From Swiss-Prot:
Component of the SWR1 chromatin remodeling complex composed of at least ACT1, ARP4, RVB1, RVB2, ARP6, YAF9, VPS71, VPS72, SWC3, SWC4, SWC5, SWC7 and SWR1, and perhaps BDF1. It comes from Saccharomyces cerevisiae (strain ATCC 204508 / S288c) (Baker's yeast). This is SWR1-complex protein 5. Keywords: Activator, Chromatin regulator, Nucleus, Phosphoprotein, Transcription, Transcription regulation. Residues 1-12, 55-72, 200-211 have a biased composition (Basic and acidic residues). InterPro entries: BCNT-C, Swc5/CFDP1/2. The gene is SWC5. Component of the SWR1 complex which mediates the ATP-dependent exchange of histone H2A for the H2A variant HZT1 leading to transcriptional regulation of selected genes by chromatin remodeling. Involved in chromosome stability.
Length: 303
């Protein structure tokens, strides 16, 4: 087939219109929209680029963002753990560099002076107390000496349950054991009168026997042997328990309590309670008499 040639013949009228057209005089001319459209075209063109390049550009933009000026709700900057740790270490190492010496106010000086005066007064009072303690120690020594003078030495040698017991101790004179020991000494002091008379009688008899005929002497009495110490006395269970009770009373400090609650004290308290009860009965009887008298008087007035 023969090739057909096509030729485009320009329209002369259109060319003339284009030559006489002024863009700025056109009513639809808006350069701002054209710029926006051009920007959109550029953006469209950029969107049409490679995906890999777009990702790289975005990462670069993210790295360039400065987050140091972002503030939290509490007002401070957002800090990482490493930043907080660095700040704490810096504060520990430089904590004494920020100290400032301030002038001491007058009130603090006055308080310091008051404390110094109080310490001086305390020292003076303590020195006075030391002197009083020394004086008290002297008085205590004198009282201990007086107490030692009031104490007595108890020496006992007796045989109980087949064993010989030797006792030697210091006790106060006013204690129960001391009183019992003193009573036993009184008994011993009163007892030797009879042996002396017996000795005199034996001597007279011996003299008479020498004059006449010598007879065998009688065996000396047991009481004399006990007093002289040749024969140790045997304690009965009752006497031993009495000694043990007296020593226990002194050791436990029950002497005053026993004196307070003895039989005489109990009887005295019973008498006191009886007197109080009788006084209450008398008062009750007196009040009853007054009530009866008032009732009789009211009955007589009513009649």
């Amino acid at each position: 087939m023969p090739e057909v040639e096509t030729k485009i013949i320009p329209n002369e009228k259109e060319d003339e219109d284009e030559d006489g057209y002024i863009e700025e005089e056109d009513e639809d001319f808006q350069p701002e929209k054209d710029k926006l459209g051009g920007g959109s075209d550029d953006s469209d063109a950029s969107d049409g680029g490679d995906d890999y390049d777009d990702g790289v550009n975005r990462d670069k933009g993210r790295n360039k963002v400065d987050y140091s000026r972002i503030e939290s709700e509490s007002g401070g900057l957002i800090k990482t753990r490493r930043a907080r740790q660095a700040e704490e270490e810096y504060a520990k190492t430089h904590k004494y560099e920020s100290l400032t010496v301030e002038s001491i106010p007058a009130k603090v000086n006055s308080i310091w002076e008051e404390l110094q005066e109080a310490s001086k007064n305390r020292l003076l009072s303590s020195s006075g107390k030391v002197g009083s303690v020394l004086d008290g120690s002297k008085e205590a020594r004198s009282t201990t000496a007086a107490q030692q003078e009031d104490k007595i030495l108890i020496e006992r040698n007796y045989k109980f349950a087949g064993e010989t017991v030797h006792e030697k101790k210091w006790v106060s004179r006013s204690s129960a054991e001391g009183q019992e020991y003193l009573n036993s000494l009184k008994f011993k002091q009163q007892a030797p009168a009879a042996p002396v008379q017996l000795e005199k009688a034996v001597r007279t008899k011996s003299n008479e026997s020498r004059q006449h005929l010598r007879r065998p002497l009688k065996r000396p009495p047991l009481l004399e042997q006990i007093i002289s110490g040749g024969l140790r006395p045997k304690l009965t269970t009752l006497e031993k328990s009495q000694l043990d009770w007296a020593s226990y009373v002194d050791r436990a400090g029950l002497n005053d309590e026993l004196v307070l609650h003895n039989k005489d004290g109990f009887l005295a308290r019973q008498e006191f309670l009886q007197r109080v009860g009788s006084a209450e009965d008398e008062r009750y009887k007196e009040l009853r008499r007054q009530q009866l008298a008032q009732q009789l008087q009211q009955d007589s007035e009513a009649s």
